[in-house]
Amino acid sequence: LAKQDVVVVSINYRLNIFGFFMHPELSDQTGNFGLEDEMVALQWVKDHISFYGGDPENITYFGESAGGAHVSYLMASPKGRGLFKRGIIQSGAYNLFDWTSKNKSEELGTTAQTLLGVQNLQTMKNLPAETILSASASLGHPFGPNIDGELIPNNLTQLLEEGSFNNIDLIIGSNKNEDYMYIDENVTANDIDKLIERYYPEHKDT
């Protein structure tokens, strides 16, 4: 990339329960803290990339797997408008089906609080990070972006179908055989039913 006159910036964002946690006591927040981290990072790039030889009006946002899905979220977010000119989504499409409503995210946050045995959010926040992460592990690491009505205004697939997204250039691709890592020799019919219910709930009874 350096030989092609590209300035590459790698960013970090909060993950799992730390990046995508919602709770009734956080009603004034989106719960999509990881995506907010990414937006701050993109704004930093836009404000400072010229000092490194980059063009603030020619930013390409690239992500793979969950990162690819995050490119989609910000592409369809009103708050992401103007942060980047082009997007590259690599193996991120399956994540578009894995969305949660704000109410369900709040319920999940309350479940995590109960699992940790604390009375309120503030007490939960004072726990060691490892303890909080263990609660997420016990729940199967279910924390991800939620439809908060602000940063993510609606179901992403619906926004894309409606044409409600920012006008950017886009490349979409997939890694060959990427999902082989998830193949399990002991898959049961019940496992398949759970996958259908998670990603295609409208077809769970067919």
Model-predicted segments: where are they?
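Serine-hydrolase-like catalytic core of hydrolytic proteins
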Residues: 1-121, 159-183
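Substrate-gating cap/lid region and adjacent catalytic-acid/histidine neighborhood
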Residues: 123, 129-206
